[in-house]
Regions:
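An extended, acidic
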Residues: 140-255
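Residue-level signal for inorganic ion chemistry
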Residues: 17, 21, 44, 55, ...
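N-terminal subdomain of lithium-sensitive/metallo-dependent phosphomonoesterases centered on the IMPase/IPPase/PAP
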Residues: 1-85, 244
């Protein structure tokens, strides 16, 4: 399938969402803390609403999975996966590392991914089998083959944080540069563009990673569970890399 209409709707949804993001960014707004200690802002809710409305107008019978509302199951082969604002903590503190993530899954495959970070002027898009692009330029993962001085970004959630920090000790004593920027979409873009060599996630949700996964894979990267098995979006722990370092990093994580 070519997914031409789906691609057009995805891009329009991104444009609509970006306008709301920009309207709220840097402004004081209502903030709530969810049960899992993450934040939700008024901007999250409005961005979520406009993306859903844009998609539903074109595809009323498609499934929609989003962070900020219940799963809309229409028993369709098509599922839209939405994170209206990834990096909400950054967003509400006016840190520009935050943005919008929308993906389309057809049956078992993520076929389209769109990440927009308006405060950083980043517009990323990928289609399965057709490459990954940032601001219209094709991107690719790094060519690094050795662990020495490689850059690994990581993601920790609030739940069982101590346990997850223990997992990072696998990298202690190694010449690896560990970084965390507070937004999964940015971490995935860093790997997809070759600015980081790998990304380790110890707890996540499908909407955090779906769009970024197709970007990484189309840029030549590799994704697996942190035990090396083939991944599913229902998993919560992942290793994402340039592919060349994947085996070496898995060996560290399996210790």
């Amino acid at each position: 399938m070519r997914f031409d209409k789906e691609k057009s709707v995805l891009i329009q949804a991104g444009k609509n969402a970006s306008r709301i993001f920009i309207r709220y960014y840097g402004k004081t707004q209502k903030i709530k803390q969810k049960d899992n200690k993450s934040l939700v802002s008024q901007a999250d809710l409005e961005v979520n609403k406009t993306i859903i409305n844009t998609i539903k107008k074109a595809f009323p019978n498609h499934n929609i999975m989003t962070e900020e509302s219940k799963f809309d199951d229409q028993n369709s082969d098509f599922t839209w996966i939405i994170d209206p604002i990834d990096g909400t903590h950054n967003f509400v503190r006016n840190i520009p590392i935050c943005g919008i993530s929308v993906a389309l899954k057809y049956k078992k495959d993520i076929v389209l991914g769109h990440i927009i970070m308006p405060a950083m002027n980043i517009n990323a898009f990928a289609q399965k089998g057709k490459g990954a692009f940032v601001n219209g330029k094709r991107i690719k993962v790094s060519a690094k083959k050795e662990l020495d001085n490689c850059v690994v970004v990581y993601e920790l959630s609030y739940n069982k944080r101590h346990e997850k920090i223990e997992n990072l000790k696998s990298f202690s004593g190694k010449p690896i540069d560990l970084r965390n920027f507070g937004a999964a979409i940015y971490h995935l873009l860093l790997v997809a563009t070759g600015k980081a060599d790998a990304f380790v996630i110890f707890s996540t949700n499908p909407w955090d990673v779906a769009a970024g996964f197709v970007l990484v894979e189309e840029a030549g990267g590799k994704i697996s569970g942190i035990r090396g098995k083939s991944y599913s979006l229902s998993d919560t722990k992942f290793l994402i890399s340039n592919g060349r370092l994947h085996g070496q990093l898995l060996n560290l994580l399996l210790r």
